[in-house]
């Protein structure tokens, strides 16, 4: 089960201790209905309107600890382009990914979204 959770959330280890899965373990054990309800709350029903580019940008920004310059460098885009994308997400969701609490909500929502996609592919 630990390896499955690790593969869902792209943890890059061939050996995975269940105790070290952290938030991924909580998301994995979350009932589908609760996950779907959380996504609805976070994205205000506009999840389908967000482009994959926007979601990928948020993911990369979070991976880089909310560092605009480093994220822009890794994505090969101008920092103003990154700021524009983050502001576009903020307008659609009301969440400012540059604020810790909002970033936490978005990170959790993206993990839940990934888990729900995995469950759908597995027929769960």
What are the residue ranges of the model-derived segments?
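Cytosolic nucleotide-utilizing catalytic cores of signal-transduction proteins
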Residues: 1-124
């Amino acid at each position: 089960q630990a390896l499955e959770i690790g593969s869902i959330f792209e943890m890059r280890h061939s050996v995975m201790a269940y105790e070290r899965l952290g938030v991924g373990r909580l998301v994995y054990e979350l009932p589908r209905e609760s996950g779907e309800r959380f996504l609805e709350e976070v994205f205000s029903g506009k999840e389908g309107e967000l482009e994959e580019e926007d979601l990928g940008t948020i993911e990369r920004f979070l991976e880089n600890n909310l560092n605009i310059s480093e994220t822009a460098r890794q994505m090969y885009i101008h920092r103003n382009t990154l700021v524009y994308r983050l502001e576009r997400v903020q307008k659609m969701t009301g969440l400012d990914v540059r604020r810790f609490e909002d970033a936490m909500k978005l990170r959790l929502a993206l993990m839940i979204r990934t888990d729900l996609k995995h469950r759908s592919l597995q027929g769960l």
